[in-house]
Design a protein with these regions (language model features):
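Terminal accessory/targeting
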Residues: 1-50, 66-75, 133, 180, ...
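Catalytic domains of cell-wall/extracellular-matrix polysaccharide-remodeling enzymes
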Residues: 108-213, 217-233, 246, 253-254
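Active-site beta->alpha N-cap acidic-glycine motif
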Residues: 29-119, 123-138, 233, 240, ...
Length: 254
């Protein structure tokens, strides 16, 4: 019996050694079938809407911010210099709610802003100084009053000034943005809520990136009324929302 037991131990030991010293085991790497690999769209392929509000803060700003909050949408505010007590709170709310503050002008007075290239940058720098000192905001994103192809650019006396402004903006490291959809709300306070909504809808034209011009002005109450419908329609059309920064595809008039 002892001999048989020793033989059994010998055989089992030999088997274990064979297993341990045999061919190395094959490592199997799990792979995700190609058909279920998630597809991630690049930013260029996505439908993105940039809601932009010029000329604020105004007495409408808080209502605009509340609507944006309700729809979980972030926007870009091209602001003026406004040092009224209510405006100071508006700047703070824009920042705390995650919106982008960009540069428009301090005065928005064409007779000052477009008097000369030097006058433009004095006005712009005044706005920059206020925003940085009071709110810690630094921005290199600019929308010049009236846009880069405004009516003054077509006048012989002011065309060189505006061309010089655009050139120096680039040289100084700013990025200027125009728009590719005009809501028409800036034409007059009498522009109706429905006209504003329709102008935005018509402007979409299957564009993937839409930069929508809206205004944040005391008298433009219909912009506030139109905003929920504008957002809802953009969502139905498959747009997501983003704010403008240095990486945003440029939209500039030619």
């Amino acid at each position: 019996m002892r001999s048989l037991f020793r033989l059994y131990l010998f055989i089992m030991g030999a088997f274990i050694i064979l297993v341990m010293t045999g061919e190395p085991s094959v490592l199997v790497h799990a792979t995700i079938p190609e058909e279920i690999t998630p597809l991630v769209k690049s930013k260029e392929d996505q439908k993105i809407a940039y809601l932009t509000f010029d000329d604020g803060p105004s007495t409408n700003t808080m209502d605009i911010l509340d609507i944006l909050d309700r729809y979980h949408v972030k926007a870009t505010f091209f602001v003026k210099g406004n040092e009224e007590p209510y405006a100071k709170q508006c700047y703070k709310e824009m920042i705390s709610r995650g919106h982008e503050i960009a540069l428009h002008s301090y005065t928005h007075d064409y007779s000052i802003v477009y008097r000369s290239t030097e006058s433009f940058f004095q006005d712009l720098n005044r706005l920059e100084t206020m925003l940085e000192k009071e709110y810690g905001v630094k921005s290199r994103i600019v929308r010049i009053p009236g846009g880069s192809n405004n009516h003054l650019r077509h006048q012989v006396t002011t065309r060189p000034i505006i061309n010089g402004i655009l050139q120096q903006l680039s040289e100084k490291g700013y990025i200027y943005f125009d728009w590719n959809i005009d809501s028409t709300d800036g034409i007059s306070p009498s522009i109706s809520e429905q006209q504003i909504i329709t102008s935005v809808k018509r402007g979409l034209k299957d564009q993937k990136h839409v930069n929508i011009l809206l205004h944040d002005i005391n008298s433009m109450k219909n912009t506030v009324k139109a905003l929920p419908d504008i957002i809802e329609n953009l969502k139905r059309e498959g747009y997501t929302f983003d704010t403008i920064d240095e990486t945003t595809p440029k939209i500039q008039f030619k």
